Amino acid sequence: MTTRHTQTRDGRIAIRRDGARLAHARARARFEWLLLARGRPSKLYGYTSRHRGERIHLPWPRYWCLELHPDPYRDARSATVWGHRWGWPPTHVRPRSVQDCALDSSLYVCCGYGEKLQPVGFVSSYLTHSPLDTLRVLLVGRDGAVYVHHMRAARLCRLASNVTEFARRGLQRDPVAYEEDLELPDRRMCGTNVRHLFDVIAAAADEHDLLTVGGLCQTHAGVSCELLETVRDPWTAVPGVRMTLTVARAQYRLWPDARRQLRLHLYAGHPLGPWIVCAVLSRERETQTPSPPIGSGGVILGNVPTPGPREVETAWVIVTVAGPLLSFWPDNGKICRLANSFAALWRMGPRAMRGHWTYSAPGRHLPGDAWPLCEHVRPPVGKLPRQRAYLD
């Protein structure tokens, strides 16, 4: 006997997970008012004004909520000491203000020219009643994407591409929530000696000693470890990528054109300071190959894409003197922020390679694409600066 909630298949009863679907539907219903931002984010101002002070529970993490407010920046300026008053969010971004924010937080905060995000309230916790809770603001773009802005650190993080994704994930793509609000374990899979070597390299990077990092990578080139990657929730991990120590000269021989592309991103006088290539991240992925057309004599599989041969995705790990780790793809020239430090990379894994934590300007790039650090402060294409900004 089968009912609406059960189905019989191969002699077994498969129970539908209506509970999870119902929970997601309820979470999406709580944030349906965010759909007013489609095409005109200013419509949210009237809604947040009428419902000012209301708290909406976030799907993740637990005990976190969104407190609606029509103008959260005004109250934050009056209640706290905010050093980035002229840095963000303006209607038009000037290179000088972007560089100032980058020098202080080691991260570019950039918004497209003429593009303005609409703030809807503060992101805070039920358990902690601290003035620092008012320094996180939730914003919505014209395309419906949801962002969180950390005013103290001058960070802008893309949380979701639409309301449905935000109702399912919450703050899962916020690196600050992963690094500070969760006690994640070390996700390295390697021996004791290799783990100690990577700990020594991480300690040298924390002390901004790039010469020591380069010397250790050159001496122990080829040593590798497996990094686990989180899926679905912060505590479920699967094998992600293999991190192998290397030197820049060896990679430049394999990718002759990548050196010039990298120097276009990290030029002399960059706010992140000098940098060095220390390791390579390699990940295997399947390619989708279309089936042969009907009548071609090949095997007919419904003319749908089938899994093809596996190829290796390669990315360089770049250590900067300012602290953060960057990831650079030598085949296409993309670059993004990988982690704040090696310790954060050990805990969070290489999720940034999939575009989860790329910091993008709204309306310019598709969600998941790696975005350059900042387009407004790039040097003009032509002769590269003579000043040396990297360590080979």
UniProtKB/Swiss-Prot annotation:
The keyword Mitochondrion does not apply. It is found in: Host nucleus. Keywords: Host nucleus. Belongs to the Roseolovirus DR6 family. Inhibits the host G2/M cell-cycle progression in a p53-independent manner. The N-terminus is involved in nuclear targeting. This is G2/M cell-cycle inhibitor DR6. The lineage of its organism: Viruses, Duplodnaviria, Heunggongvirae, Peploviricota, Herviviricetes.
